[in-house]
């Protein structure tokens, strides 16, 4: 039974609803709707000019309506009279096929048709920085190896504990918070869930972290590589696939190597097979490739892959299998679109199952120290353009995630790349002025 948002508002003393959708660039767009108007909005959606956001629409297109999914509603823990609700984009009574949440829901349905239910968890890393974005916010956070630094995490206790308290209140079952590998960097973990719920939570988490940071006079950034020499922001995804009832882990087989079933290996095979193209989605910005292809950081490791390899419980590879029945994809970064991350995982994995893709040889080596010894593993893209070209050339993955989405995404991302290429940098001036 669908939750009545008007009744929810009366019960929770909600004054306003934020009807929110995410565009192709990961931008979160919303209208603030008074509770008195939510009944009509729940039925018809909130109207937007689609051209005004990144969805590959023109000014001539009719209104885009964001129809709230009542099952996703969250009362803001820090502002109780406002509720946030994720929405699906509709135009002329039809889904907008390139809209990220629509793309994900279609792939969830495809997996269900094959008797599969995908569950994931994400680990979004972020920096707490000054309000102007110029430096990390804690002037005393200067250790060469700051990961898990007890003093540093407690100096930001007010921010981290407030966010964690809100996750506890929302029933997300958070289980740990830590200072990450870069100065000023943090990670907060909560329990895995069905992919759509994980994507909605991921989207809300970014909104919540930024809001709480602003409340404390700070700024939170999920930018992949905001500071030269420091470890970048990853967004590792832990993936498992279950039967449609969510009771039997289809990836788990104690008799198989790494505890990963034959079906799990073909799903992983799809991830490995399509990895260079996958990067166009999991690493969607120019800055993303400053993380993937970074030299050694201050701490001694980038903690990000640059080669398409997999392993057991070893964090130097693109895919880690830490235990039976699941694997960790370490490729995505903090700029990844919460909905497209989950969508591309399902698309590549299902294509892998259908084609019986082999994940190839696993490696037990330290890729940071010995990666040069691996001669036959593909390198990940050097930059966004290489990733876009890999995605455009991967007809199987484009078909799996959807032709309308693929066309719109490639068009807009090529425009972004071209804008970057026309930008004049200080490096060019320093390197060329006196030639």
Swiss-Prot record:
Residues covered by the GS catalytic domain: 100-435
Positions with a binding annotation for ATP: 240, 315, 320
Highest taxon above the source species: Bacteria
Boundaries of every GS beta-grasp domain copy: 12-94
E.C. code: 6.3.1.2
Keywords attached to this entry: ATP-binding, Ligase, Magnesium, Metal-binding, Nitrogen fixation, Nucleotide-binding
Residues annotated for Mg(2+) 1 binding in this entry: 123, 236, 328
PROSITE patterns attached to this UniProt entry: GLNA_ATP, GS_BETA_GRASP, GS_CATALYTIC
GO BP: any one term: glutamine biosynthetic process
Residue sites binding L-glutamate per the record: 232, 291, 315, 330
Keyword Cell inner membrane annotated: no
Cofactor, free-text remark: Binds 2 Mg(2+) ions per subunit.
Catalytic activity annotation: L-glutamate + NH4(+) + ATP = L-glutamine + ADP + phosphate + H(+)
Pfam families linked to this entry: Gln-synt_C
Note: Two forms of glutamine synthetase (GSII and GSIII) can be found in this nitrogen fixing bacteria, GSII is a typical eukaryotic glutamine synthetase whereas GSIII is a divergent type with very low sequence similarity to the type I and II enzymes.
Assembly: Homooctamer.
Role summary: Catalyzes the ATP-dependent biosynthesis of glutamine from glutamate and ammonia.
NCBIfam families cross-referenced by the UniProt entry: gln_synth_III (TIGR03105)
Official protein name in the record: Glutamine synthetase
Source organism per UniProt: Rhizobium leguminosarum bv. phaseoli
Gene: glnT
